[in-house]
Amino acid sequence: LFRSGISSLIPSTWKVEEGFDYHCSLIDVADVLGIHADIIPSDVPYIRIPENLVGYWKRQLGQILPPAKHRIGLVWQGNPDHQADMFRSFPLDSLEPLCELDDVQLVSLQFGRGSEQVQRWKGSKPIYTLPQDIDRSSGAFMDTAAILHHLDWIVTSDTSLAHLAGALARPTVLMLGFTPDWRWLLDRDDTPWYPTMRLVRQKRIGEWRSVAEEATAFLASKLGESQ
């Protein structure tokens, strides 16, 4: 999937001793190139999904999910082994305010760890689940990327799917912890990386419901605009 947005990809396991002019640590690239927040390239989408896969998932979702006016994809759990996971992932129950939205269908994009929380969901709207073998045959993120194409909005924690949605220019609400990763900066609700993304920030460590309430209010206004 990510090869569609670059001219070439060299795996880190390859030993490359010639054929390049410069070498630079990835974390230093922005500084070396003189890139700052105001000039970060944000021409999205910069990765492409095969049309046949997009069409396949349009048909599949039509069979798996009932008709809906608006579909909202949900992700709440990142990698539990991440050193900051306790500050960026949140319980699924925190998203209960989303049930206040009219004419929406909630769809879980949570696969593997964290997906078991759907069984304990007590919200007034059901959460529809997708097959757990997604991406296993088509390649990492391929099916997921095609599915995002058929959702109106994505609500997600700070995990890999947030970056996938942003790179695909999908409308996204990112729920951030009190002290987020450096790339999300501070004191702003947008991001120079992904122009279709809205940032909703936690005001107090560990308190996620108010973040979901703010996300819900934002979505209500955007969905109202599309009526």
Residue ranges and their predicted role:
Residues F2-Q227:
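Catalytic machinery of carbohydrate-active enzymes
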